[in-house]
């Protein structure tokens, strides 16, 4: 019997491998290839902190447990290490052997210290002495307390030997004679990592800050010479949960979690050296295994090179600019109240601008007829205009209530700051729910329209974050549908006050009803499926890991239901297995925008339904988070969403298809086929719509009236 489920962690690694695949594409602009390499690194940072740490904890607590994909924690850790070592090796080989030389061809030449000419050596020597040396703090390691190494910060390690052993014995700063003389220097955050060199004839050359510290770091240790050195960083366990049963202040409890994250156990050492003495020293001190150590050649962190985007050369080495079009259904200058009273409006970022969401909140803050604003915030970014609008609304006397989810991983500190700032401005802030993360994205404005109090609702698959809205593909809906508005009211009452679970008529809410609704709709497809008219399920999401849902999809496949899945990241479902999943196809898209929308289509005989959601089909989303799934009821919007969904299954440029052996195979252009790149097709659709609208505007006659 073939495996029924792929392993979650190994499936995630395959997702990062698909990102790396794009970095190898020679047809992509150079800076975009470098960007994909950088994403591989940042993704691994989170993966090791959260997922690898989780498996390591399981190995300690329950070492013999076997997961549904057949792995014990120990065997899984071996597989993780082998796959990650392979990807990281390929990543850095591509960086140093292909991308760095290509940068040099584009007049952005990375230079090692050994390659500097005499003039440049004088420059870097003076630069180090004047601009770098004052920032550096050497940390000795022979004291009883090993120096604290900050999670994900980069360091230089020096293995030292006394120049004069007799003289060193008499020094009050000699340290423990028997201890290895290893010292650390943290690479300062306040300095640019790229140091430009003096050149002639307009040529641009640079060295990296860390290599200056490697070269001149001896100056930090008078009386010693450097035998060996290397650059390194560590990743620590970051998968902490707050004590939600604590009687103390919840913000204080969250701050304790942030402190713990900086001193937890180490799960990875990434370094640039084969210096066995330093590696062995760190291995012992950090209590790690050989499988946890990743040694790379050349530049440790490709992300430092992304600053090259800001150069004149770098600006010409990226994707051609794609405009974010203002939706033609919404007026740029006037408030949206009149439009939304008559129709639902779909917003598709980043092809369409995120400005309407900001304008919607800003208009509500300033409108004298608006009585109240309620919304959820999960990740909203820095310098958010949404926060400014909410504060202004409170200052204008509106009742403003915001649920800020403090437990949004790696955004806890920022969200604590927003919560405090909003409270200081007079906003009522709710800090989420006990033992549940609120991941739903919903905004409701209550306004007095003539003699009627009307509720304007915005629901989204993505966060209220203007910055990521330029990079993540998400769908959202503006509506005044009465059933949805009534459900929105009940939702806010449940998450901000005390309430029994309320039955919702149009919305589905996790952990209450999304899972059961999905299972019911899958079963409905099975019940209505015939040989003449087989059922059809089409779904797009970030990850698919919920075993109950996967089993239901297997059952649907066996009943003849056709299942098309677009899964960007983790997929534990095994497709294409006869007698289990032969009617299931799984594809994944990795392109310039991160695919983030969740779209679920059920054919339902001749009465098809489409839902959008904040939730993926994962246990955490369906059982441990507060999520919302909302129907598309407007016929025009329904048609639009279905056309968007269909495009993702036409892609033959940036798609991979999952096979039953777990391999993701690139979907290639076949002979006679036209090129179909889903994101480009969507961009061109919105551009045509915008261009057509602009032409219509130009043809309209505007009568100039006499000003009295």
Where are these regions (language model features)?
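Glycine/threonine-rich ATP-lid/beta-loop region of ATP-binding domains
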Residues: 547-550, 554
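N-terminal localization/anchoring segments of enzymes in phospholipid and broader phosphate metabolism
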Residues: 1-537, 555, 559, 571-708
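Hydrophobic alpha/beta core scaffold segments
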Residues: 562-566
């Amino acid at each position: 019997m073939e495996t029924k489920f792929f392993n979650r962690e190994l499936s995630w690694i395959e997702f990062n491998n698909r990102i790396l695949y794009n970095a190898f594409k020679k047809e992509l602009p150079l800076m975009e290839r470098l960007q994909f390499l950088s994403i591989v690194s940042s993704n691994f940072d989170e993966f090791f902190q959260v997922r690898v740490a989780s498996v390591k904890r399981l190995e300690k607590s329950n070492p013999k447990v076997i997961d549904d994909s057949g792995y014990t924690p120990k065997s899984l850790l071996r597989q993780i290490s082998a796959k990650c070592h392979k990807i990281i090796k390929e990543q850095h080989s591509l960086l140093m052997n292909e991308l760095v030389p290509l940068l040099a061809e584009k007049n952005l030449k990375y230079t090692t210290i050994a390659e500097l000419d005499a003039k440049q050596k004088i420059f870097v020597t003076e630069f180090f002495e004047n601009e770098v040396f004052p920032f550096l703090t050497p940390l000795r390691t022979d004291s009883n307390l090993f120096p604290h190494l900050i999670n994900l910060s980069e360091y230089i390690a020096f293995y030292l030997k006394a120049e004069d052993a007799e003289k060193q014995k008499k020094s009050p700063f000699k340290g423990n004679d028997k201890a290895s003389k290893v010292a650390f220097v943290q690479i300062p955050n306040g300095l640019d990592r790229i140091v430009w060199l003096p050149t002639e004839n307009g040529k641009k050359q640079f060295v990296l800050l860390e290599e200056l510290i490697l070269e001149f770091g001896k100056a930090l240790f008078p009386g010693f010479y450097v035998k060996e050195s290397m650059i390194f960083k560590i990743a620590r366990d970051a998968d902490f949960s707050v004590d939600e049963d604590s009687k103390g202040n919840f913000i204080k409890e969250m701050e304790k979690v942030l402190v713990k994250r900086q001193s937890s156990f180490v799960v990875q050492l990434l370094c640039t050296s084969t210096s066995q003495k330093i590696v062995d020293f760190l291995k012992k001190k950090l209590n790690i295994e050989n499988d946890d150590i990743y040694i790379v050649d050349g530049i440790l962190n490709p992300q430092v090179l992304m600053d090259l985007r800001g150069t004149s050369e770098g600006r010409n080495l990226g994707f051609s600019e794609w405009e974010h079009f203002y939706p033609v259904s919404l007026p740029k200058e006037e408030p949206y109240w009149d439009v939304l009273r008559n129709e639902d409006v779909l917003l598709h970022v980043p092809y369409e601008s995120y400005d309407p969401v900001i304008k919607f909140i800003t208009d509500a803050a300033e409108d004298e007829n608006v009585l109240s604003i309620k919304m959820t915030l999960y990740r909203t970014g820095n310098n958010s205009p949404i926060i400014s609008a909410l504060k202004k609304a409170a200052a204008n006397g509106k009742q403003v209530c915001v649920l800020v989810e403090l437990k949004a991983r790696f955004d806890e500190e920022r969200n604590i700051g927003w919560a405090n700032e909003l409270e200081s401005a007079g906003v009522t802030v709710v800090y989420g729910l006990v033992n549940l993360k609120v991941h739903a994205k919903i905004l409701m404005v209550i306004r007095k329209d003539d003699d009627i109090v009307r509720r304007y609702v915005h629901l989204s698959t993505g966060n209220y974050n203007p910055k990521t809205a330029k990079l993540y593909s998400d769908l959202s809906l503006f509506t005044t549908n009465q059933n949805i508005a009534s459900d929105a009211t009940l939702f806010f009452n449940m998450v901000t006050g005390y309430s029994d679970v309320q039955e919702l008529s149009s919305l589905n809410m996790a952990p209450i009803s999304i899972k059961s609704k999905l299972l019911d709709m899958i079963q409905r497809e099975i019940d209505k499926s015939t040989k003449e008219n087989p059922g059809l399920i089409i779904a797009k999401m970030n990850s698919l890991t919920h075993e109950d849902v996967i089993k239901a999809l297997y059952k649907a496949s066996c009943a003849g239901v056709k299942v098309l899945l677009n899964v960007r990241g983790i997929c534990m479902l095994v497709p294409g297995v006869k007698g289990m999943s032969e009617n299931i196809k799984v594809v994944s898209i990795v392109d310039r925008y991160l695919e983030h929308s969740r779209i679920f289509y059920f054919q339902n005989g001749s009465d098809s339904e489409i839902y959008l959601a904040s939730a993926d089909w994962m246990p955490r989303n369906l059982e441990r988070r507060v999520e919302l799934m909302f129907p598309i009821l407007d016929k025009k919007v329904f048609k639009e969403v279905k056309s968007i969904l269909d495009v993702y299954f036409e892609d033959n440029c940036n798609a991979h298809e999952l096979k039953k052996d777990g391999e993701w195979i690139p979907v290639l252009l076949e002979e006679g086929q036209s090129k179909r790149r889903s994101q480009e097709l969507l961009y061109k659709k919105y551009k045509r719509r915008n261009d057509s609208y602009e032409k219509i505007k130009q043809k309209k006659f505007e009568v100039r009236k006499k000003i009295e």
